[in-house]
């Protein structure tokens, strides 16, 4: 199918590449070594990946709907009450889709449309009702969210075109569906 080969598969591959770059940028955000440049770079990588996701929303049929991937990646609105509750037990597995995906990462990385200040990650958050949340916990949460996001982006890609062995292995390791029965 020309649409799959020329549009859908390349778009999802590029989305995977962009989310990998975001994952790499988030990996530089450790509480002790974080700099404003690291935060700004992660924000730029987020915007690039998010833009690619927006392009892919033109074809949310097939695997995106068959396997409920879209709500997992792009739930809106972010459930801040559930997110705050999660930070009360940050070692728990994140099962609530309303605190995963792009909007969760956006909340961690940005305030009022601008990259957050590095000081907020070195101390406590300044967002209303989140001032009791440590920036270090937010960074750990962001790492869990990006890993989950990456797996689901890979799931989209390999569901349409399972030729990338590395990404297919990641999807299988995460026990995600990529083929209909």
Regions found by a protein language model. Name each.
Residues 1-181:
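Mature extracytoplasmic or organellar-lumen-exposed domains after removal of signal/transit peptides
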């Amino acid at each position: 199918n020309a649409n799959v080969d020329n549009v859908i598969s390349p778009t999802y591959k590029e989305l995977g590449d962009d989310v990998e770059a975001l994952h790499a940028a988030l990996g530089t955000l450790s509480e002790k070594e974080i700099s404003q440049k690291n935060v700004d770079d992660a924000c730029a990588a987020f915007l690039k990946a998010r833009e690619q996701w927006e392009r892919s929303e033109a074809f949310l049929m097939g695997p995106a709907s068959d396997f409920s991937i879209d709500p997992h990646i792009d739930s809106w609105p972010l459930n801040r009450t559930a997110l705050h509750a999660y930070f009360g037990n940050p070692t728990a597995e994140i099962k609530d889709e309303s605190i995963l995906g792009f909007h969760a990462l956006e909340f961690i990385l940005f305030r009022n449309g601008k990259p957050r200040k590095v000081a907020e990650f070195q101390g406590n958050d300044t967002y209303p009702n989140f001032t009791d949340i440590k920036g270090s916990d937010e960074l750990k949460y962001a790492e869990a969210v990006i890993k989950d996001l990456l797996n689901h982006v890979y799931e989209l890609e390999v569901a349409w075109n399972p030729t990338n062995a590395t990404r297919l292995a990641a999807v299988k390791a995460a026990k995600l569906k990529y083929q209909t029965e």
